[in-house]
């Protein structure tokens, strides 16, 4: 009999009616961003009301999936079993102007730089969860 050790699952996002579109879009290979229906401002993370005009009306737009690294950190500790370390995590400024936090993949952690151009890649981290991550271009 062979024992196989399976990797622990990543922590699950807390799904709400305001953010579930984002994770459903990721499963379909789409980077969806919330847009205020009243003033057109894009926002991320998703939330119920627009910070600019206070409207509760919104829709979504598909982002191009390209941008640059606005800021980043490299996580070394504490190590959580579901992740590989060192773990570069960036604030990515999308071409559309809004920013989001995501893993940086396909590059050594010490090679990540502010201003580095990146493109989205959708990674199925397990059978239930697909996340947008960014790879240098």
Please provide the spans of the model-predicted regions.
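Well-ordered alpha/beta subsegment
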Residues: 3-4, 97, 102-137
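A broadly conserved sequence feature marking short terminus-proximal activation segments
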Residues: 1-31, 137
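Short, cysteine/histidine-rich loop/knuckle motifs that typically chelate Zn2+
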Residues: 35-38, 49-55
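Short, conserved beta-turn/loop elements at beta-strand boundaries and strand-helix junctions
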Residues: 58, 73-78, 109, 123-125
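Cys/His-rich microdomains that often coordinate metals
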Residues: 42-43, 56-57
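Short, basic/aromatic beta-hairpin or loop at an interaction surface
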Residues: 85-100
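Residues immediately within or flanking Cys/His clusters that coordinate Zn2+
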Residues: 30-33, 47
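Conserved hydrophobic positions within beta-strands
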Residues: 67-69, 104
């Amino acid at each position: 009999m062979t024992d196989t050790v399976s990797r622990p699952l990543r922590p699950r996002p807390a799904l709400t009616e305001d953010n579930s579109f984002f994770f459903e879009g990721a499963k379909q290979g789409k980077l969806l961003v919330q847009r205020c229906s009243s003033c057109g401002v894009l926002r991320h993370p998703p939330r119920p009301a627009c910070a600019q005009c206070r409207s509760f009306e919104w829709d979504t737009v598909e982002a191009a999936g390209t941008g640059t690294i606005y800021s980043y950190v490299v996580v070394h500790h504490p190590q959580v079993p579901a992740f590989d370390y060192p773990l570069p995590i960036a604030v990515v400024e999308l071409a559309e102007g809004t920013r989001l936090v995501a893993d940086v993949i396909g590059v050594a952690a010490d090679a990540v730089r502010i201003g580095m151009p990146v493109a989205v890649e959708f990674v199925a981290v397990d059978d239930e969860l697909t996340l947008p991550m960014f790879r240098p271009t």
